[in-house]
Amino acid sequence: MVSGEAAHNASEVRSAIEQILTPLKAAGVPFSTTKGNHDNEKYSTHGSITDMEHAFAPGLSYTKKAPAGVGGGMAGSDNYWVPIYRDAKAKRGSKPALLLWFFDSRSGKTRLSDTNGTGDEEQQEIPDWVDPSVGQWISSESQRLQRQWSETDDADDDQGNFPPSLIFTHIPAHEFVTTQSQEPYSSNTGGVSSEAPGNFTTLHRAYPGLEADEHFGGQGGESTSYEGQDRAYLESFFLDPQNPTSTSRCHGIVSGHQHGNDWCAPSSLRSRGMQSKSRVPLCFAKHSGFGGYDEAKVWNHGVRVFHFNTTNVQTGVETYVKFLTGEKRYNVQLDEEWLNKVPGERE
């Protein structure tokens, strides 16, 4: 959310957070946030910024901190879920139509007040992947929710199915690296170098999008060599037969971090709840183009939008990039047909 390395004290961090959230607060729009490597710095942590959100916009911020012992402390605190209901009449605590999951990929540097000294030399690097404890929390939390909903909902409600999900985590999982760099998807993904107005092409790729960041490490591969550091939460969510999340549809994993990428494409991840040859979609969120090595002339100003329809929330979701000009690009439905545009036999 903020470039914490530029702050001189915690008050400056708070002022920046309030500046970001003021339009949402004025409009009364609820929001949830993920945080990244620049938020863990001298005068802030992911957890302290979440506290600032709640203090400034109580009732609007849906961001939550994980229970104690989950996520790796205040630097990785924001592991939570947000329920999306079919309508405003839904009972509080009843089973939602959709779950938004947020997993904290940590990274950045330790806060000065969390070290023994006061100088820059005292800051320590924070691991750049979702803490393994989150995998255990996913298991216990999803099972708890399933029990709760089975006790409160009608017996015929979706035949006991766990709600579909959409996952947000700032630093992309290593699966993003694999999709962009290995076949069968690498030659069918991205390919766009400029999104300037009037300069639109898909290069006839099945999964087009901006691909200015051609080489990146993903979780576990930025400051160290990748050795499966991000597998704990992914395997818990998608593969553990004890977890209800593994039996439901995941509409995608959404990440930022790579400012120059905004493509969506399949991955090698398979959810037990999806058809045997279907892969979990991966989507880069669109960098807004305001700040953070601004490339607006080439990358354009925009956001990634997900549009859910309650009539088909179990089978797919519409997504596209919308620019400040009002233009939409890469409008697709993340469904079975889209997933199988390119045969995905890679294991």
Predicted regions and their residues:
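Structural recognition of the beta-strand scaffold that forms the well-ordered cores
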Residues: 1-2, 30-35, 41-42, 81, ...
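Residues that flank catalytic or metal-binding motifs in active/ligand-binding sites
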Residues: 76-78, 96-99, 163, 249, ...
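His/acidic metal-ligating clusters that form di-metal
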Residues: 99, 115-262
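Short aromatic-enriched loop/helix-cap "lid" or pocket-rim segments at secondary-structure transitions
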Residues: 43-47, 113-115, 178-182, 266-267, ...
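Binuclear metal-dependent phosphoesterase catalytic core
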Residues: 84, 220, 261-347
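N-terminal active-site segment of His-dependent metallophosphoesterases
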Residues: 1-15, 19
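Active-site environment of divalent metal-dependent phosphoester hydrolases
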Residues: 4-9, 33-44, 78, 109-111, ...
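Extended active-site neighborhood of metal-dependent phosphoesterases/phosphodiesterases
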Residues: 16-159
